[in-house]
Structure formats: C-alpha cells, structure tokens
C-alpha cells in the first residue's frame, strides 16, 4: 500500500501538478501498489465513448490493429484513456482485484466483485497490457 491518497485523486496527477485528474495531461498509472483510498480492478471491457471511438476508427482507416495501436498509445502516453482529439473517454467493466485499506469495511465492494465504472476513463488511471479484441460495431475493446 502506497499510503494515503487524495479524495479527489490528485495524488495520481503527474502533469501538470496541482490539478484534478480529468484535465490533467498525464496520470500515474502504476498499479503495482495502490493508495489506501483506491480500488484496483482487472479490466475486462472498455466501452469507449462513441465520439472517441468513431474518431479513432476513422484515424485508423477502420484497421483493427491500428485501432489497438492508437488506444494503447494514448494510455501509454497519458496514463488514462482520454482521446486528445475529442477529450472524451468511456467506462470499463472488470473484476475487483484489491481494495485499499481506507475502503475495507466502509464500502460495499470486495475483491472478486464484478463492477462497472461510473466515472469517465478520461480521469481514471488505466494501464493496458494487451488488447485482445476490438468490437467496432459496439465501440468496445477487450
């Protein structure tokens, strides 16, 4: 455990310092250790915002491998999925891997729970190791 995290997530902001995660350019997406107020989730599906997915798909000329490259590139550079053209992100579905100490017993979530995020990927620290599938018809990546 890394220690106490900010209630607003500013502890994850790398650039520029002192602002909230959504307008930030770069977030720390190192998930090896989490802060006491965080939940680490193994993401299974990214539901990419429609405007963002359409823009990425057009930039890639519809090529699935290029779509993967663009999405992986955004996340690698920014530590989150915030499309630099549209400014939008999306949401995820996944399984809770670890719950921070400050949340244990206080929030109705435990390791192994399947969850869907209710906040945008444009402010959520995200690390993608691999994109297995692109579902162009429903704006999803797996």
Where are these regions (language model features)?
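Short peripheral tails and domain-boundary helices/loops at the edges of structured domains
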Residues: 134-142
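Short glycine/threonine/proline-enriched tight-turn/helix- or strand-capping micro-motif at secondary-structure
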Residues: 17-30
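Glycine-rich beta-strand-centered segment in the early N-terminal region that forms part
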Residues: 32-47, 58-122
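Short amphipathic alpha-helical segments
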Residues: 55
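Short, Lys/Arg- and Gly-enriched loop/turn segments at beta-strand edges
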Residues: 52, 121-133
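A generic structural signal for short, solvent-exposed coil/turn residues
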Residues: 2-5, 18, 33-35, 88
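A conserved mid-domain beta-alpha-beta active-site/ligand-binding segment of alpha/beta enzyme cores
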Residues: 10, 14-18, 79, 124-128
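A eukaryote-biased signal for short, well-structured alpha-helical docking elements
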Residues: 1-13
């Amino acid at each position: 455990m890394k220690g106490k995290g900010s209630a607003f997530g500013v502890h994850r902001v790398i650039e520029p310092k002192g602002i909230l995660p959504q307008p930030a350019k770069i977030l720390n997406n190192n998930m090896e250790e989490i802060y006491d107020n965080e939940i680490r989730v193994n993401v299974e599906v990214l539901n990419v915002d429609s405007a963002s997915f359409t823009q990425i798909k057009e930039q890639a000329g519809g090529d699935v491998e290029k779509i993967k490259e663009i999405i992986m590139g955004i996340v690698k550079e920014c530590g989150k999925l915030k499309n630099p053209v549209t400014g939008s992100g999306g949401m995820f579905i996944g399984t809770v891997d670890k719950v921070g100490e400050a949340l244990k017993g206080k929030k109705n979530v435990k390791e192994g729970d399947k969850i869907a995020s209710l906040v945008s990927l444009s402010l959520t620290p995200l690390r993608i190791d691999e994109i297995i599938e692109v579902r162009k018809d429903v704006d999803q990546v797996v």
